């Protein structure tokens, strides 16, 4: 009897495949959407900038005027000691948080809420930004980094600017050890071994005197879990 596939082991939920969230600094999201933000604004001061393992962008510890502290994603150009504003009457300046309906068209934004008050869900990676395209009655259209235009509630909050940490992909890893340590902070099983490079006991494509599949790559959607590799329930394969 063969061994279980990686996809089967992943479903068991062992520590190897779990995201090591215990290494994180904490939840990175907006403060609660209260009357101070809905009617005016609240000031906060950046007291520290931290590296968060497993996250591609640095985070800042912000202390607000009511002595509340939050971890937030910061834009390029922010430094310790600067003030940020959160609320409907905040200035259009990098780092400030406003509802989408109050942000002019063409302004880059990030950490966008999908539901007002959810803390920010979209565009959170280092160097990323979206653009406010247009406003209409009861909706705002935002162009995401993928090119997809998303319709959102104008009350959803976003931060003005570009997420810090851009250009991280321009520097190559060079060494496998650096790649290993980078991915050890995430729920990524690495290195990824090809099925044809394994032994027959480890994978349906393993074994043989040379590396080849040895069987059709298309499999039924209803086949057994240990055989479900390759093109699963594919309508067609190969070039078009």
UniProtKB/Swiss-Prot annotation:
Residues 1-28, 206-240 are annotated as: Disordered. GO terms for molecular function: rRNA binding; structural constituent of ribosome. Residues 13-28, 224-240 have a biased composition (Basic residues). The keyword Transmembrane does not apply. One of its GO terms (cellular component) is cytosolic large ribosomal subunit. SMART domains: Ribosomal_L2, Ribosomal_L2_C. Residues 1-11 have a biased composition (Polar residues). Belongs to the universal ribosomal protein uL2 family. Part of the 50S ribosomal subunit. Forms a bridge to the 30S subunit in the 70S ribosome. This is Large ribosomal subunit protein uL2. It comes from Methanococcus maripaludis (strain C5 / ATCC BAA-1333). The gene is rpl2.
